[in-house]
């Protein structure tokens, strides 16, 4: 529908608000209502029987053929549904809803010409008799027709669906249409905003409950799951809800559960394209090419030109990181329908994740030209603008894109670390990844989220690897929660190895487990380690079965749950390597690359999954028992006792002498009462009992506070050194230790701590200045110049003096560089006397070294 037609309809609709003119007497509302209730509750066969009888008895009203056709479609009787609609149109030629249904049904039957004709007929009807179509359901139907004809989605949202909502607030039609369109365009915030009150108003409407579940699925998983359950209670055969259940089961690698859900879907509609498409996905993930082809053919049985089938297949494959196969599926969808924009959007994202940027961005721009409302496309193109301000660093094996200032500050160290990871890991796993490995580091968390997930406001991820492409959050985006960015990049490059080596056919738990395992091998301070929470879970028999580890990442309800999933996965890998050797692990990866399933690969190389499960549980429990043996970490008894002061804590400890929460509380209370010696003794004992505790609020950090208050700097430095040997993330402790090293005149250690701090937060100006001072004193000129160069980026207002200091250091080392920097100083501060004097010195030295004629 062209913009003129939209405007004409809207103008007419404004004039006729409140009118609802039909072409005859209304049908018996209670009878129609009964059939509508049957459809809404999933009683499709009963609805079909009732509507068939009503039509045979010549009952009047467009609702009868509409409901009959909808029930036939729900049961997979696609040709019959189209015949019902055509017959209905013969009697109700004015019905825009029947024409819209004809469009959908014709597409479901592969009749594109008939579908196009139905759209044109609606457009003609609206243009000539717009006064007829002002009811909520008509507005919704005509709005969808307008979308199909290429109308601007925002204009449709405002001109049709919003009008249906506002003029008929007691009807669900406008809310359903507006919510569905918002979700189709990725506008989940708007969808949630309008559907939240609608779900309360229409609490028995299964479709509204389902759409709200979809809208909040990222923001509130628990509430979304409850709404999904409510949907299925209202309609046990709700296609969208059952599809979402099956998709979730696929995400969790519960393929048998997904197949059971698919069987339930097919028991209602044996020809449901979505069900067969999801079965195709499972077959492809299981390396069953012939079965996948058969399922795809079944999905396309009635419409071989349906692009939604391949689009769904590709979307799920993409979510499983099978980007090459996913892209191929989207290309197939576009071959069937070159104008199917959702496939173009998904293909653009898949190509970007494959590192095929030129075509990926071209497709994104083309898709945006076709649909300016799609928020995913808007976010992607905003991201492209941000990337245009990045610079590219290269090394033999990597191409790193960073914001320009960040690249100047720590880009050199990024490249060095990545090359170190290549040198260490490629021979270890006997695999050379495709070159170049592309790394993108984002200073804005939303840019990282859009590049990685297609949407902003996704938190909790430090980095992601797609196979050839790594995306990571810059330390600048994590300054409130600092972590070692070096460990993140090492972790992600390990994913490059495991994903590419297996053709992205590796289960998430194994890929994550290997990455964390290799983090710990590279640096004992990196990766997840045993802690009291993990210990309690393990000894409390909450070990996740190996076969369910991948799902543990998706079902985690807290950061602790997620960290435990990483830890468990890494310990499975450690156990495999310690018992069966690294060659067994590599053999599993090789098997996965050929399409062998993980359980079969483990059977072949680790003695079988059942035996591995048993030995792993024993191994992990031994690790837990050996960590802080004899210490009681339980919180329940201490919480029940509710001690309020030091004496009551001591009283509790008389019967619970090894209770860690009580011992820590005792130490804290002793500190509050300034009983330093007693606090020191208590904390020393805790350090001995729990030597592996590297938490920022653990006994070592509290003991360091004791020494700091007593100004016992040597002891404070010693305990902080112990602490920082176990963690690479405690920025505050690292900065304090650097200060202590300055006080002790341990300048080498000042520089060492400066490097540690740089590996957490390279933008700490105070730490850089302290490292610089130590380097200058020790005449470590290379280190000093590096610190000054960093300060040039972070303190541009002091650039003349910084250039001068670099020139002074390099005067005896590299006169050319010295001259360049002194000239830069004078360029920015022409009256800089010291710089003029240095330039003269350089000139005299240059003249003195020139050969005589």
Regions inferred by a protein language model and the residue ranges of each:
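Start-of-helix register in tetratricopeptide repeats
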Residues: 29, 63, 97, 135-139, ...
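Juxtacatalytic substrate-recognition/specificity segment
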Residues: 30, 83, 114-121, 125, ...
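Canonical positions in the second alpha-helix
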Residues: 53-54, 87-88, 122, 163-164, ...
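Structural marker of alpha-solenoid helical repeat scaffolds
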Residues: 57, 91-92, 125-129, 166-167, ...
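Canonical tetratricopeptide repeat
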Residues: 67, 101, 141, 177, ...
């Amino acid at each position: 529908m062209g913009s003129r037609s939209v405007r004409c309809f809207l103008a007419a609709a404004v004039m006729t608000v409140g009118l609802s003119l039909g072409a005859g007497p209304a049908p018996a509302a209670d009878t129609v209502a009964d059939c509508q209730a049957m459809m809404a509750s999933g009683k499709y066969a009963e609805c079909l029987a009732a509507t068939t009888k009503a039509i045979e008895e010549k009952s009047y009203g467009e609702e009868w053929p509409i409901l009959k056709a909808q029930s036939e479609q729900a049961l997979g009787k696609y040709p019959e549904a189209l015949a019902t609609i055509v017959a209905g149109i013969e009697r109700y030629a004015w019905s825009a809803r029947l024409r819209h249904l004809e469009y959908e049904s014709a597409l479901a039957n592969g009749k594109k010409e008939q579908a196009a004709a139905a759209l044109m007929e609606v457009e003609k009807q609206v243009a000539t008799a717009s006064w007829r179509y002002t009811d909520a359901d008509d507005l919704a139907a005509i709005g969808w027709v307008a979308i199909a004809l290429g109308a601007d989605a925002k204009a449709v949202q405002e001109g049709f669906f919003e009008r249906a909502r506002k003029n008929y607030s007691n009807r669900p039609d406008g809310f359903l249409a507006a919510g569905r369109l918002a979700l189709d365009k990725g506008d989940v915030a708007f969808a949630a905003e309008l559907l939240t009150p609608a779900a309360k108003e229409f609490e028995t409407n299964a479709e509204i409950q389902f759409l709200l579940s979809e809208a909040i699925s990222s923001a509130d998983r628990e509430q979304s799951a409850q709404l999904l359950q409510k949907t299925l209670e209202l309609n046990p055969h709700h296609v969208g809800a059952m599809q979402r259940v099956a998709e979730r089961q696929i995400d969790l690698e519960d393929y048998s559960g997904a197949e059971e859900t698919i069987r339930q879907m097919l028991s209602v509609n044996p020809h449901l394209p979505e069900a067969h498409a999801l079965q195709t996905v499972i077959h492809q993930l299981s390396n069953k090419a012939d079965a996948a082809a058969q399922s795809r053919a079944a999905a396309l049985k009635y419409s071989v030109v349906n692009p939604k089938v391949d689009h769904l297949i590709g979307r799920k494959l993409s979510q499983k990181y099978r980007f090459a196969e996913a892209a191929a599926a989207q290309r197939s969808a576009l071959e069937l329908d070159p104008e199917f924009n959702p496939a173009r959007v998904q293909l653009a994202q898949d190509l970007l994740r494959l590192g095929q940027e030129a075509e990926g961005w071209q497709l994104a721009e083309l898709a945006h030209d076709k649909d300016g409302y799609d928020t995913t496309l808007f976010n992607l193109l905003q991201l492209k603008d941000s990337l245009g301000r990045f610079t590219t660093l290269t090394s033999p094996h990597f191409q790193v894109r960073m914001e320009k200032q960040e690249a100047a500050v720590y880009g050199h160290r990024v490249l060095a670390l990545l090359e170190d990871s290549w040198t260490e890991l490629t021979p270890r796993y006997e695999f050379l990844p495709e070159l170049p490995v592309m790394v993108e580091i984002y200073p804005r968390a939303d840019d990282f989220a859009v590049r990685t997930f297609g949407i902003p406001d996704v938190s909790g991820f430090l980095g992601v690897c797609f196979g050839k492409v790594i995306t990571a959050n810059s330390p600048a985006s994590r300054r409130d929660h600092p972590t070692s960015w070096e460990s993140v990049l090492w972790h992600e490059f390990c994913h490059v190895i495991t994903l590419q080596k297996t053709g992205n056919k590796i289960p998430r738990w194994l890929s994550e487990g290997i990455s964390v395992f290799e983090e710990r091998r590279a640096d004992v301070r990196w990766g997840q380690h045993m802690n009291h929470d993990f210990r309690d879970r393990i000894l409390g028999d909450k070990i996740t079965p190996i076969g369910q580890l991948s799902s543990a990442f998706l079902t985690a309800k807290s950061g602790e749950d997620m960290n435990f999933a990483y830890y468990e996965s890494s310990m499975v890998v450690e156990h495999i390597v310690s018992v069966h050797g690294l060659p067994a692990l590599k053999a599993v990866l090789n098997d996965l690359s050929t399409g062998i399933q993980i359980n079969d690969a483990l059977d072949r190389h680790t003695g079988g999954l059942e035996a591995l499960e048993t030995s792993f549980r024993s191994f992990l429990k031994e690790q837990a028992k050996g960590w802080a043996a004899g210490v009681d970490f339980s919180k329940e008894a201490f919480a029940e006792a509710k001690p309020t002061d030091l004496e009551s804590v001591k009283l509790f400890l008389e019967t619970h002498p090894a209770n860690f929460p009580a011992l820590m509380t005792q130490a804290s209370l002793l500190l509050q009462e300034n009983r330093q010696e007693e606090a020191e003794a208590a904390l020393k004992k805790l350090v001995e009992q729990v030597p592996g505790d590297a938490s920022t609020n653990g006994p070592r950090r509290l003991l360091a506070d004791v020494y700091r208050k007593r100004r016992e700097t040597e002891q404070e430095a010693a305990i902080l050194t112990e602490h920082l040997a176990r963690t690479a993330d405690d920025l505050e402790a690292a900065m304090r230790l650097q200060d202590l090293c300055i006080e002790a005149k341990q300048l080498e250690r000042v520089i060492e701590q400066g490097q540690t701090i740089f590996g957490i937060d390279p933008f700490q100006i105070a730490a850089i200045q302290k490292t610089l001072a130590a380097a200058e004193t020790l005449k470590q000129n290379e280190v000093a110049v590096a610190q000054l160069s960093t300060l040039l980026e972070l303190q541009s207002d002091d650039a003349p003096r910084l250039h001068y200091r670099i020139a002074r250091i390099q005067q005896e080392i590299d006169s050319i560089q010295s001259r360049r920097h002194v000239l830069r100083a004078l360029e920015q501060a022409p009256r800089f006397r010291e710089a003029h004097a240095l330039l003269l010195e350089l000139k005299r030295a240059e003249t003195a070294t020139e050969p005589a004629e």
